[in-house]
Amino acid sequence: EATSALDVSVQESVIELLVRLQKEKNICMIFICHDLALIRSFAHQIAVMYLGHIVETIPGEDVSDHAVHPYTKALVGAQFSVHMDPTKKIESIESEAPSPLDVPVGCPFQNRCEHCMEQCKKEMPELKEIAPGHEVACFYVDGMKKQTKGGR
C-alpha cells in the first residue's frame, strides 16, 4: 500500500508520478490499496479481493454505480465524503471476518453476506463476465442476472 500512511498532498504527488510513469513507459501497474476512492480516481480496472480471492473486477469509472458483489457494494457504501448527503447511512459489515488461516469452504464472504445461500457454503463461485470488463464471483448475482435476463 504505497500511499496508506501518507499525507493527502503527498499521496496525490505519488499518484501523479505513478500515472505519469505509466503513460511515459507504457506499462501496466498493480496498485494494492484499501482506499477505494483513491483507486477509483486513477485506475482503469479494479480487482476487489476478499480473503485472498478476487470477488469482482470492474472498470474504475464504474465501481461506484455498477458494483454488484455484496463485498464491493459494502466497500462503496462505507465510503465517507464531505459532499455526501448527511442523511445517507454509512454502510458497515456487521460480523467479523474469518481468519485468513481458516477460510471457510465455499464463498469466502459467506458468513458476512446478507444474501448467503446453501450453494455459497459448499462451492466457490467462479468469476463470470456480466458486462464488458466486469466480472463477479457470486451465486446471488448469478441468480439475479438470470431473473432479469441481462446485466446492468
What are these regions (language model features)?
Residues 1-88:
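P-loop NTP-binding/switch modules centered on Walker-like glycine-rich loops
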Residues 58-152:
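Charged, flexible cofactor/metal-binding loops and thiol motifs
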